[in-house]
Design a protein with these regions (language model features):
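Conserved functional hotspots at enzyme active or ligand-binding sites that engage polyanionic ligands
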Residues: 1-113
């Protein structure tokens, strides 16, 4: 079963405009009941482009890539719904400390105080 806090590779194409596309890591942010019963998942895309100014809706994490940990940004300002058919394979489970940061950034992204 796919669980909240897991990171998977997913095919995000096709896209429009400034959306993140291609095959890239995504963080599952949907609750586990939804993950179990829904044909879709709510995810946040992840990028290795960490050279720009970080926003309060972004969380820096290290995720495995090519047998080493790579600094990456979870883009919680770009959350989207994907069909489960777009999910390719699991990369890792995010640490609980990082999920606390994700929850804070998600609140900012959707305007929850």
């Amino acid at each position: 079963m796919i669980r909240r806090g897991e990171i998977f590779y997913a095919n995000l194409s096709p896209v429009v405009g400034s959306e993140q596309g291609g095959i890239r890591p995504v963080l599952i942010i949907q609750n586990n009941k939804g993950n179990l019963f829904s044909p879709t998942l709510i995810v946040a895309p992840i990028t290795r482009n960490v050279n720009k100014k970080m926003q309060p809706t972004q969380v820096m994490v290290d995720i495995p890539h090519d047998d080493r940990l790579t600094p990456s940004l979870i883009l919680l300002e770009q959350i989207r719904t994907l069909d489960k058919e777009r999910i390719l394979h699991k990369i890792c489970q995010l640490h609980e400390d990082d999920m606390i940061k994700v929850n804070q950034a998600l609140k900012i992204s959707v305007g929850i105080r």
